[in-house]
Amino acid sequence: MDTIAARALTVMRACATLQEARIVLEANVMEILGIAINRYNGLTLRGVTMRPTSLAQRNEMFFMCLDMMLSAAGINVGPISPDYTQHMATIGVLATPEIPFTTEAANEIARVTGETSTWGPARQPYGFFLETEETFQPGRWFMRAAQAVTAVVCGPDMIQVSLNAGARGDVQQIFQGRNDPMMIYLVWRRIENFAMAQGNSQQTQAGVTVSVGGVDMRAGRIIAWDGQAALHVHNPTQQNAMVQIQVVFYISMDKTLNQYPALTAEIFNVYSFRDHTWHGLRTAILNRTTLPNMLPPIFPPNDRDSILTLLLLSTLADVYTVLRPEFAIHGVNPMPGPLTRAIARAAYV
């Protein structure tokens, strides 16, 4: 299946180079399109030409690219247009070994397959405590009953620790059961002035320490903590104290947008509004997948099918921009006139 996807990507990118009718094509583009179009026309009985000039010819070439995108992604889109019918035989065209694929396309598909079939450490973009169900007012003393050290969440990436005079304790537990981190990068600071429960102000005295694995850590410096070593706080002074611990970032096995080069840009290209026809076509295609059909996914996709679909659909979007096809989509009423931000914004409502 990797070679099928690589051929589809190669052919679509070759079609995206046809920005002028009289353009001098590169030799490899002529070879790719010559073989691919010949095989495609023979199996589907379409009349795609290598140098489309009329609207009908541009439509035919775009429909060929659409067929290849759907076949490579394994999508059966169904009846979406009175002008287009998906040709299932296109998979046979892409399976033809005579159609070459570029090194770039093959490498990209190999990266998609390789990265989605395994896991690796990645810097996560969200706060470590993002999904906490409760938070506490920053800089306000809070001590639970029968405790001398109390740690609470006060933000998506922040905890604060209240300590009685002379208290020592381990605050590791507040990090447990969250995000399965491989490494957490922390910075701790003294809260110089804080409010007691009665509202009066109190100062944290110098001498309060935070240690990892028994080694005191300097305040205001990034600490690499594996989440397993003891994370101790100690207040040797004779007054109550508070410290703040910030998670600068953390590393885990969760997939991010860095798993594939330019994945963020590919997603933006897919979900961008070009016109109402493209908007309806993209929606109809993504309705047959697990991806959202109008707005980008909340979390990075982590399976091969989703990332491959985004890559292929982004390339099809480039072909759409170049060929400027005109055809109808069921349920879509194109609006005449120039494209404006207001028109694009209204399409997502």
UniProtKB/Swiss-Prot annotation:
Tree of life domain: Viruses
Compartments, record wording: Virion
Sites carrying sugar chains: 287
Molecular-function annotations in GO: host cell surface receptor binding; structural molecule activity
Main location: virion
Keywords: Capsid protein, Glycoprotein, Outer capsid protein, Virion
Gene Ontology biological process terms, A to Z: fusion of virus membrane with host plasma membrane
Pfam families, per database record: Orbi_VP7
Gene3D superfamilies associated with the record: 2.60.120.170, Bluetongue Virus 10, subunit 1, domain 1, Bluetongue Virus 10, subunit 1, domain 3
InterPro entries attached to this UniProt entry: Capsid_hemagglutn, Orbi_VP7_capsid, Orbi_VP7_capsid_C, Orbi_VP7_capsid_N, Virus_capsid_a-hlx_vir
Annotated Gene Ontology cellular component terms: viral envelope; viral outer capsid
Family designation: Belongs to the orbivirus VP7 family.
Described purpose of this protein according to its UniProt entry: The VP7 protein is one of the five proteins (with VP1, VP3, VP4, and VP6) which form the inner capsid of the virus.
Quaternary structure (record): Homotrimer that assemble in a complex of 260 capsomers on an inner scaffold composed of VP3.
Protein's UniProt name: Core protein VP7
